[in-house]
Amino acid sequence: MNNNFCIGLDLGQASDYTALAVVEKLEGNGASSSRNCIALHLRHLERYPLRTPYPEIAERVAALMRSDVLTVSTTNDLLQEIRVPPELVIDQTGVGAPVADLLRERDLIFRSVVITGGDKVNREGRVYRVPKRDLVSALEVSLQTGVLKAAEGLELWPALRQEM
C-alpha cells in the first residue's frame, strides 16, 4: 500500500527560510481521468524561523514523518500491521547534503533532488539531478491546469505564490 502524502523540504541558509510542504496525491474519484493524471492538494505549508538549527529541523521532520496524521496503517500477507510513512523529498542543493545526513541518522528514507542548470534529468539511486527549468515548468503547468490546488486557509500560500 502506498501513502498518498508527500512531504517536501527546501532547506534555507542564514538569510533564506527553510520551508516544508505537505501534498496529498489523489487518484481515482478525486482526480482527472485523462492520461492517468492525479490531483495534487497542498494541505500544509510551514516556514521555519531564520537560523533554526538543522538538527532541530531534522527532529521536527522526523516527528512529522512518524505522526499518525500522515502515516497509513495496513496489513501484509502475514496479517502483520505495517505503518507506511509519507514520502519525503528534500532539496539537496547547497546545505541539503549535511541535512540529508541528519535525516539518515534518524532512520528516515527519502529522495533527494539536486537542482541544476543542465538540460536533462539524471538519477543516481535516490538522488535526482533536475534542471531548474523542468521544476518551474512542471509547477506552472500543474497550477494552470488545476492539477495542483492549495487548501483554503493556508496562511503562507499568498507569500509562496508571490515568490514563484
Language-model features: locations:
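RNase H-like, metal-dependent nuclease domains and their acidic two-metal-ion catalytic environment used
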Residues: M1-V114, V121, R126-R129, R133, ...
